Amino acid sequence: MENPHSILKKVFGYDSFRPGQEEIVSRLLAGQDVLAVMPTGAGKSICYQVPALLLPGITIVVSPLVSLMKDQVGALVQAGVAAAFLNNSLTDNQKALMLHRAREGWYKIIYVAPERLEMPGFQRFAQERQISMV
């Protein structure tokens, strides 16, 4: 059975969590809301990526930085994680394909820009899916 430590090792290649990460992961897996304020390079992404892979639905990550979305998704895909981003750097055809694949259950983690949350089409998409975390 998968657990946070096995995901951490198998997917991300780390033997152990950094200080504070395991508590955040445990709380998220318990369904608690968490605000984690950590310095740059402290491993915030692992704190939501590990639970995202253990929870049943999709995790939506809201990020205002297109370059960060691309970097994060690229690293996740390279690690074998089904991830995608949806922002204005994509063409209309690319957006439609991404949403089509998301509806078919291709992705575990989807990165979106904050303004995407206000778009009726995305709201309908989110209402039709099982969203585990935002």
Language-model region placement:
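Walker A/P-loop
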Residues: 31-50, 60-65
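Conserved pre-motif I regulatory segment
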Residues: 1-39
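Hydrophobic positions in the central parallel beta-sheet of the AAA+
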Residues: 36, 60-61, 84, 110-112, ...
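Short glycine-/polar-rich loops that comprise or flank the Walker A/P-loop
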Residues: 56-58, 79-82, 107, 130-132
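Conserved Walker A/P-loop ATP-binding site and its immediately adjacent core
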Residues: 57-79, 88-90, 94, 113-118
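Residues at the C-terminal ends
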Residues: 29-30, 54, 78, 104, ...
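Conserved helix/coil segment N-terminal to the catalytic DExD/H
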Residues: 42-45, 49, 90-133
